Regions:
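Histidine-dependent nucleotide/RNA phosphoesterase domain, centered on the 2H-phosphoesterase fold
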Residues: 1-234
């Protein structure tokens, strides 16, 4: 956990001046119907309790800066691993869904449920993130099992091609336009810097086909597993 705290702290130090000085990178493809980037991801959606607290935080920001992109409550999620990073033109018909689902199930059969504590926020040059802290090494083991199984299967994948994921953060806001009220935004960010959003009990995982923003209007569930069910061992 100390490593994660240090990493999140470094992210904050490296990027918070961008928010103070209205110099954030902006994402111009949010809500662009021509954006055809698609991929395959293993994830877990937030429960109502954590989702509600994050949404309350986002509502405070939205009142000040309504032009930014705020993740809807039902789209907040923990990314376990990107199997195929979003590629322009990638289609579900490019893969054998049954093969991917089978590898997914084999990868997680020895993993039980785990918890992620969401406490505090940090920032990147273009986003506001909720800090996540797993309660044990299960998430790390899970990611390594997925990496090993998909690499052995030699199916199309781009695992770790952008970066090797090691955190449990959740993206909550994407900057899509210059800020109009930097000082007010900074006050809210400072208030929530160490805020306790609650604990996510990760009892199920999904393998999904998705776009860059994980919009549910585009997301298709390919396989879902209950981590606490004996049925997954059969």
């Amino acid at each position: 956990m100390s490593n994660l705290k240090s990493l999140y702290s470094k992210m904050w130090i490296d990027s918070i001046d961008r928010f103070k000085n209205n110099n954030c990178d902006t994402d111009l493809l949010v809500n662009d119907s021509k954006d055809m980037r698609r991929g395959i991801t293993v994830l877990s959606y937030f429960n109502d309790s954590v989702g509600a607290k994050v949404s309350n935080f986002l509502e405070e920001l939205k009142i000040i800066e309504p032009e930014q992109y705020y993740y809807p409550k039902n789209e907040l999620h923990l990314t376990v691993l990107s199997i195929v990073s979003c590629i322009s033109g990638f289609k579900l018909s490019n893969i054998d869904v049954e093969e991917y689902s089978s590898i997914f199930k084999d990868s997680v059969k020895e993993i039980g449920g785990f918890k992620v504590k969401y406490k505090g926020i940090t920032v990147s040059p273009s986003c506001i993130l909720i800090q996540g802290f797993p309660d044990n090494e299960q998430l790390s083991h899970l990611r390594n099992f997925l990496r090993t199984h998909f690499n052995k299967a030699k199916l199309q994948s781009t695992i770790d091609s952008r970066y090797k994921i090691s955190t449990a953060h959740t993206t909550a806001v994407r900057c899509t336009a210059p800020f109009k009220h930097c000082e007010a935004i900074m006050k809210v960010l400072s208030t929530y810097r160490d805020y306790d959003f609650g604990t996510l009990e990760v009892n199920s995982l999904e393998l999904v086909f998705n776009n860059w923003y994980q919009n549910l209007s585009i997301t298709k569930s390919l396989s879902k597993l209950d981590l606490n069910s004996s049925e997954r061992y059969k």
